[in-house]
Amino acid sequence: MTRFIMSLDEAINLVLFAFEHGTTGDILVQKAPACTINTLAEAICELLGGNKENIRRIGIRHGEKMYETLLTNEECANAIDMGDFYRVPRDNRDLNYAKYFVDGDTDRNLLTEFNSNNTELLDIEQVKNKLLSLEYIREKIVSITHRI
């Protein structure tokens, strides 16, 4: 089971990027890395001095997804790669199907959906580094180590 992982600063950067580069109706998606839930649990355990043996694997809850999808196949087909982001412009096509049958649509990308299972997967050290970039986590580590 995988999930995207993004800090608050990265989320703010996405919003600022959208303001600068997006237009009405666009979808903007950051090419965020992901990690498995197990990797996240082990990274937190290591950071907080916990015992990994205490991690319980309870399986998938009813209705829970194995991975998150940020862009579907159709959205990826129209996506514009902007480096660290994808931009999916709003659909401005008209209903003139005759034009489609004459001209076709050869500009469509052939990307598959962008999901947490086919993006960069972080290992335990990378997840720990991302978590340590968060002030809340650093404060929590200090408060726990002072109690011991």
Label every model-predicted segment.
Residues 1-148:
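Strand-loop microenvironment adjacent to phosphate/nucleotide-handling motifs in alpha/beta enzyme folds
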